[in-house]
Amino acid sequence: MKLRGLYAITDSQLLSGKFLSYVEAALDGGVTLLQYRDKNSDESRRLREATELLKLCERYKTRLIINDDAELAARLGVGVHLGQSDGSLPDARALLGHKAIVGATCHGRVELAEQAKADGATYVAFGRFFNSLTKPGAPAVPLDLIAQVRARVHLPIAVIGGITLENAPQLVEHGADLLAVVHGLFGAENTQEVTRRAKAFTALL
C-alpha cells in the first residue's frame, strides 16, 4: 500500500475544547492518515469521538486509524496502530481483514519492523527523533536508522517524536514516508494556523 504524507495524531488534552474544529482544520490542509489517540477508559466517549472523526475523514477522504484498540477499529471498519505492548498484530490483522491499515510501533529497532512485516503490518513507525512533548522519556533514535529500515523492510516508514516544520525536512531527506505529528500540528493558536501547518507538512512530501 502506498502511504505518504502527513500523519496527524490527536491528543485529548491538547485538543480539549477544540477537538473537532482543529481536526477538521488539519484535514482541510491535507492529511493522509488521522490517528485517534485517547488513553481514556471511557469507552462510550471514545466510540462517540471516533465516530465523529470517521465522518470527517470520509468527507475529506482521509484514512482513520485507532490507537491501541483493534476492537473499536473493527467496529468502525477502520485501521489500527499497535504499540509493542498493545496486543497481537496477527490477531488485529485477522480481526480487521487483509485490506485494513495496521501500523506497528518499532521504537528504534529494525528487527521489530522485520517482525511486524512478517506479522502483516501495513506500515512501521519509528521514534522519537527529536525532543517530544507527548513522550518525553522515550529514547532518541538516530536519523540514519531510516535508511537501515528502508534497506531491510520494504514498507512505508512513519516517523514520530518532536516533529516540527523546521526539522521535518531532515526526516524526509533520510527517507521517511509519513510524518506523524501531534504538537507540531495541533499546538497552533487557531484553526487557520493548523491548516497552514498541515499544508506545509504535506508540501514536504
From Swiss-Prot:
> Does the entry feature the keyword Magnesium, yes or no?
yes
Sites binding Mg(2+) sit at: D68, D86
Query: What does the record give as EC number?
Result: 2.5.1.3
Q: In which pathway does it act?
A: Cofactor biosynthesis; thiamine diphosphate biosynthesis; thiamine phosphate from 4-amino-2-methyl-5-diphosphomethylpyrimidine and 4-methyl-5-(2-phosphoethyl)-thiazole: step 1/1
Q: Supply one GO BP term.
A: thiamine biosynthetic process
What chemistry does it catalyse, as a reaction equation? 2-[(2R,5Z)-2-carboxy-4-methylthiazol-5(2H)-ylidene]ethyl phosphate + 4-amino-2-methyl-5-(diphosphooxymethyl)pyrimidine + 2 H(+) = thiamine phosphate + CO2 + diphosphate; 2-(2-carboxy-4-methylthiazol-5-yl)ethyl phosphate + 4-amino-2-methyl-5-(diphosphooxymethyl)pyrimidine + 2 H(+) = thiamine phosphate + CO2 + diphosphate; 4-methyl-5-(2-phosphooxyethyl)-thiazole + 4-amino-2-methyl-5-(diphosphooxymethyl)pyrimidine + H(+) = thiamine phosphate + diphosphate
- Binding positions for 2-[(2R,5Z)-2-carboxy-4-methylthiazol-5(2H)-ylidene]ethyl phosphate? S132, L133, T134, G162
Which is an annotated GO molecular function term of this record? thiamine-phosphate diphosphorylase activity
Please list the cofactors this protein needs: Mg(2+)
User: Keyword annotations for this protein?
Assistant: Magnesium, Metal-binding, Thiamine biosynthesis, Transferase
GO CC term, one of those recorded: cytoplasm
Q: Does the keyword Transferase apply?
A: yes
Cofactor binding: number and manner: Binds 1 Mg(2+) ion per subunit.
Q: Which residues bind 4-amino-2-methyl-5-(diphosphooxymethyl)pyrimidine?
A: Q35, Y36, R37, D38, K39, N67, T105, K135
- What highest taxon heads this organism's lineage? Bacteria
Report the top EC class in one word: transferase
What the record says about family reads: Belongs to the thiamine-phosphate synthase family.
So what does this one do? Condenses 4-methyl-5-(beta-hydroxyethyl)thiazole monophosphate (THZ-P) and 2-methyl-4-amino-5-hydroxymethyl pyrimidine pyrophosphate (HMP-PP) to form thiamine monophosphate (TMP).
The name this protein carries in UniProt is: Thiamine-phosphate synthase
